[in-house]
Swiss-Prot record:
It is an enzyme of class 3 (hydrolase). Mg(2+) binds at residue 6. Its EC number is 3.1.-.-. SUPFAM superfamilies: PIN domain-like. Gene3D superfamilies: 5'-nuclease. This is Ribonuclease VapC3. Its cofactor is Mg(2+). Belongs to the PINc/VapC protein family. It comes from the Archaea. Keywords: Hydrolase, Magnesium, Metal-binding, Nuclease, Toxin-antitoxin system. Toxic component of a type II toxin-antitoxin (TA) system. An RNase. Its cognate antitoxin is VapB3. The gene is vapC3. GO terms for molecular function: metal ion binding; RNA nuclease activity.
Length: 94
């Protein structure tokens, strides 16, 4: 089964959290291009970069950008302003 893992999950794995690793070990894990950006903003070790680069990626594309824009407008009308990074990640799966 496929699973998309978020930045916080990867950071927990990098910190040595074995419980987190065991929870995802039976899945075919993927990350988004937005998650790659978030991780590369930090101070990654070489082995962490290799792990990130080895995971399959789901990319933010033209379709995702339109979806994100429409979701943002809808939420803004409702008085809610979402986290832009979370909105971009969510739009990849919509």
């Amino acid at each position: 089964m496929d699973a998309v893992i978020d930045t916080s999950v990867i950071i927990e794995i990098f910190r040595g959290n074995k419980d987190t690793l065991y929870q995802i070990c039976d899945y075919n894990c993927k990350i988004t291009s937005i998650t790659v950006f978030e991780l590369y903003c930090g101070n990654l070790k070489e082995n962490e970069m290799i792990m990130i680069d080895s995971l399959p990626k789901l990319n933010f594309d033209d379709k995702s950008s339109k979806i994100a824009g429409n979701i943002f407008k809808k939420l803004k009308k409702e008085g809610k302003i979402p986290s832009v990074k979370d909105l971009l990640i969510a739009s990849i799966f919509y």
